[in-house]
């Protein structure tokens, strides 16, 4: 799963001189893209679920499984595995055979010799999430599965203050022989195979490379994937080059009947991957230079910035001036949530007593979500009724709740009911004990963030609540959130798999300070979460997920605003591009024209 900045932009633009189309070596195919926010690190255990970072890593690292690029609904395929895993009858033991003859990209740590991928590399990659040295915020993905022996290894390292013992074998993750990987869960999980398809959470990492670079491993990712890192200017540009040792797989999936899937499959037939020699990713944080650069031909495709949707697709149709240039348009509802959370341990907005719950509900009802959707999101997107997004299990289009309501009158009534009233006549409400009431929302500093803040300020003022803003960068806010020093903050979560259970896991008590940023802890919710995760998808699981969603609406640790809609533009000559709702490692399938002489 991936965190994204709330409104998809951040704080600064590249200098104008950087926006000219760069020269490329004649005949080479160079895919050119732009990110709207900077990456964090290129170490998979330290990404903090950052969307852009994980997207880059997914081109470099490989998991045993992956998604069929052109299949809809999503379907799993073996990647480095010979076949899909064998699963025990109780849903706890997953055994997979890694294909022989797959090699890591060249690196000095290998001493000039080819380094074959083996099952032990996956065991090592999993163990790194448990190593206290790396303090991984994504550890919860494994901890919740209770892999036998791994938490104990971590606890031993913490208590002894000694290095994590990677050499000790445990049942949770074990190499049975050179190519056979066995993962044992402490609790059944019918959807664990989705984690086995995540190139970041289960991408193979070579121990020699980590030992070689030590604490600087975040700048030196090495994997078995189609691309390798060629250069990296932090927060500015990432360049990936074709991995010359890549095995040159071909697309062998089952494409959907959709015309885009059929056209892509026809183009990919028999072609060895990747189709491009290089990928250049610029970080262009402000939307205008990103948009203008696409129009100038610098980038091969672009997720249309929200502020330019009216220019790109008036009335949801591709603008004629773009169509005449051969540019094409794709749209898709994201499996995501745009939300803000309340830190549940904060003395003002946290807590589980009726007055604190009433305050959070009032804030949620007072926020003008329709204004957010109609202004910044240009009317695109779907009002959210729960934390569970479209395209995932547990999502119900007919589910309706207070989460999607904008009702200032009801907000005022709740505030009055619980004693949040204006006692001194200055126009601002005080707390029930008469002390000052001042909300503080954490935020980035971009123009997009300022727009969101204006809506928050106006909404809160309308019901008599003061609101100030704490401005910081995206990485700084991530750190503060993990440290529990924010009162309120907002961002987006994007699904990494079809399992909607993750969007309940962000409120699961044991995940506090990891994915559970509000540190919500409610035993009744935790029991529902634990029960649903053991069940296969079906009516019984759906019913439990609905009850869990009801509790999140009632206690309001999150105010979820909407599920966003993505618009992609592609330049003429871009072939085999069809956005997948979950798959990140798709750059190897994209084809672009070679550079002209």
Identify the role of each PLM range:
Residues 148-162, 167:
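Surface-exposed intrinsically disordered loops and tails
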Residues 37-56, 80, 108-111, 137-138, ...:
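A structural "hinge/loop" feature
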Residues 34-90, 222:
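N-terminal lobe/hinge region of extracytoplasmic solute-binding protein
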């Amino acid at each position: 799963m991936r965190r994204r900045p709330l409104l998809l932009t951040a704080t600064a633009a590249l200098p104008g001189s950087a926006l000219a189309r760069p020269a490329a070596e004649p005949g080479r195919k160079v895919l050119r893209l732009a990110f709207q926010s900077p990456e964090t690190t290129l170490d998979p255990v330290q990404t903090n679920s950052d969307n852009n970072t994980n997207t880059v890593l997914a081109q470099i690292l490989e998991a045993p499984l992956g998604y069929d690029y052109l299949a809809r609904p999503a379907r799993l395929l073996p990647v480095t595995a010979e076949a899909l895993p064998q699963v025990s009858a109780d849903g706890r033991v997953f055994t997979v055979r890694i294909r022989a003859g797959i090699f890591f990209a060249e690196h000095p740590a290998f001493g000039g010799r080819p380094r074959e991928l083996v099952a032990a590399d996956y065991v090592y990659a999993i163990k790194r999430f448990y190593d206290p040295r790396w303090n991984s915020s994504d550890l919860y993905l494994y901890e919740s599965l209770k892999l036998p022996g791994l938490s104990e290894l971590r606890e031993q390292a913490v208590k002894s203050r000694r290095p994590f013992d990677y050499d000790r074998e445990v049942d949770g993750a074990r190499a049975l022989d050179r190519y056979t990987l066995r993962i044992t869960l402490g609790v059944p999980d019918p959807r664990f195979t989705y984690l086995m398809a995540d190139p970041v959470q289960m991408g193979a990492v070579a121990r020699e490379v980590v030992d070689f670079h030590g604490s600087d491993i975040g700048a030196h990712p090495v994997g078995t994937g189609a691309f390798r890192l060629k250069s990296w200017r932090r927060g500015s540009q990432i360049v990936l080059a074709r991995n010359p040792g890549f095995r040159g797989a071909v697309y062998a999936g089952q494409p959907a009947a959709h015309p885009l899937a059929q056209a892509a499959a026809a183009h990919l037939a028999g072609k060895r991957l990747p189709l491009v020699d290089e990928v250049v990713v610029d970080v262009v944080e402000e939307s205008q230079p990103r948009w203008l650069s696409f129009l100038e031909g610098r980038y091969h495709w672009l997720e249309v910035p929200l502020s330019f949707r009216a220019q790109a697709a008036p009335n949801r149709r591709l603008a004629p001036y773009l169509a005449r240039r051969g540019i094409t348009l794709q749209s898709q509802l994201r499996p995501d949530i745009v939300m803000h959370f309340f830190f549940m341990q904060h003395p003002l907005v946290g807590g589980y007593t009726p007055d604190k719950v009433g305050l959070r509900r009032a804030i949620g009802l007072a926020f003008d979500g329709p204004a957010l959707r109609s202004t910044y999101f240009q009317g695109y997107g779907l009002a959210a009724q729960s934390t569970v997004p479209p395209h995932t299990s547990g999502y119900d289009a007919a589910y309706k709740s207070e989460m999607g309501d904008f009702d200032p009158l009801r907000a005022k009534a709740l505030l009055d009911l619980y004693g949040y009233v204006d006692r001194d006549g200055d126009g601002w409400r005080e707390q029930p004990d008469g002390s000052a009431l001042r909300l503080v929302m954490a935020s980035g500093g971009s123009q997009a963030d300022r727009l969101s803040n204006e809506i928050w300020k106006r909404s809160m003022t309308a019901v008599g609540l003061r609101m100030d803003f704490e401005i910081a960068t995206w990485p700084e806010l991530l750190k503060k959130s993990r440290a529990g020093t924010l009162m309120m903050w907002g961002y987006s979560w994007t699904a990494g798999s079809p399992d909607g259970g993750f969007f309940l896991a962000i409120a699961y008590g044991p995940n506090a300070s990891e994915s559970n940023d509000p540190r919500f802890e409610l035993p009744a919710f935790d029991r529902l979460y634990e029960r649903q995760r053991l069940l296969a998808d079906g009516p019984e699981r759906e019913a439990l997920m609905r009850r869990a969603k009801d509790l999140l609406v009632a206690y309001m640790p999150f105010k979820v605003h909407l599920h966003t809609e993505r618009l992609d533009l592609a330049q003429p000559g871009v072939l085999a591009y069809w956005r997948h709702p979950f798959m990140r490692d798709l750059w190897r399938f994209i084809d672009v024209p070679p550079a002209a002489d």
